[in-house]
Amino acid sequence: MQNATLSSPIQISERAQVLDVLRGLALLGIFLNNIYAFSGYGFLEEVQQLKFATYQMDRIADYLQTTLVEGKFYSLFSLLFGIGFSIILRRGEQKGNNTTALFYRRLLVLFLIGAAHLFLLWEGDILLLYALLGALLPLFRNCTNRTLLIWAAALIISPVVIDLMKLWLEASPAQFLLPIGVAIDAENGITEQNWRSFLFTENSGWKEWRAWQESGWAIRFHYLLDSNRLPKVLGVFLLGFYAGRKRI
């Protein structure tokens, strides 16, 4: 009975409505960020885009998407993830329960959904990353608020140091992944010359999509590592954890 109570969804009366609104906004932003690729427009050469009567409006939309949307909403989503962790801990403490096991069970479900999404449907998945980095959050549960802020600041600023190290060493920890992705693509007939049109040839379908997605994990993790997304996301997780503790 105790486990059933602990695992039950948060009642509507317990939810902060503003968090639900922000979650919806974050999801909308992530959708808008990905619609450029989903539509196929991003795969077109500029000479092909020029043929559209809406080309000038498309350029404005592209600028607005890059300026206002791209890379912005994952930070909000990460912040809410950290706040969610603090809410799980608070509920457990109020009931006198240890919520770490519950948190890891939820992360396992998130991991499985994210893995299926990444390997089968869309290389732009973020759920797998959140599950992996979220597994580190319980390590910070006993930190003071000041320590949380120090860790968060250090992680968020760390990409500056990491990029300087890359320049100094002339190497990147992600560099081994790109050749793997290129090799997988080559086996599936995807080359530098045809990658833009591979999915849009006549009679293309699920088989071509699966061939395209086969290298997605390597390309995705190359991007995540090369863009220093991991420390930035974990740092924002911790900011969210701090905000949740303070009930900001």
What are these regions (language model features)?
Residues F31, I157, F237-G240:
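Hydrophobic residues within the alpha-helical transmembrane core of Major Facilitator Superfamily
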Residues I12, A16, K51, Y55, ...:
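Membrane-helix interfacial "entry" motifs
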Residues S75-R90, L128-L139, N228-I248:
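Specific transmembrane alpha-helix
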Residues Q2-I83, I88:
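N-terminal signal-anchor module of multipass membrane proteins
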